[in-house]
C-alpha cells in the first residue's frame, strides 16, 4: 500500500523476503528483482527458515524472564525473517536512496536495517504495549531513525513515554485502505443472509 501510493512522486524499491508463510519464512517466491504495479521488488533468500520449536523455546525463555541481554540478537534472528543479504544490500547501496522506510518494529529486517542506515531511516513501528518492547535490542528502532511515522496518536504517546524520543521528527497518518466504489450494508445482509452480525477488521490469523 505505502509503496504503490508513493510511485506518483518517487521511484520506489521494496526489499523483502521470498517467503509467504510468516511461521517458517520458507523461500517460495523466485529470488531476484521484478516490477510489480510500478514498484521495483527485490526478493532476498532467508538464510535459515524459522524452526517453530526453536523459536518457541527461546521466546518462552524470554517471556519467563530468563533471556540474557546478549541473547536478544539470537531471538531476533529466530523471529526472522533472517535476511543478512538484505542488510548487506542496505549498507552497499545506501547512497543510492533518499530514504528507507521500515515497517513494523518486531522483525529482523527493521531491527537490523534501522541500525544499518539510521541517518536515512523512517520507522513505521506499529507498536503497542507488549512484552517484546522490554528488549534493549529494539531501542535503536525508536531512538536512532531520522523520522517516525505513527498509525495513531495513542501509539505516538506510548512510544514517546517509553523511549523519550519526542525530539525525533514524527507524523501520524495510518496505513490507508482502498474502499470499494459501492458499499451497502443492505446488500451485504442480502448476499449473506445475515440480520445481525459482528464485523472483524484485520488479517485472518489464529493469534488474532
Give short role names for the model-derived ranges.
Residues 12-14, 122, 128, 144-153, ...:
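A short beta-strand/loop micro-motif in the catalytic core of glycosyltransferases
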Residues 52-108:
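Conserved nucleotide-sugar donor-binding subdomain of glycosyltransferases
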Residues 115, 137-144, 156-177, 191-195:
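Helix-loop-beta element that forms the nucleotide-linked donor phosphate-binding surface
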Residues 191-208:
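Conserved donor-binding/catalytic core segment of Leloir-type glycosyltransferases
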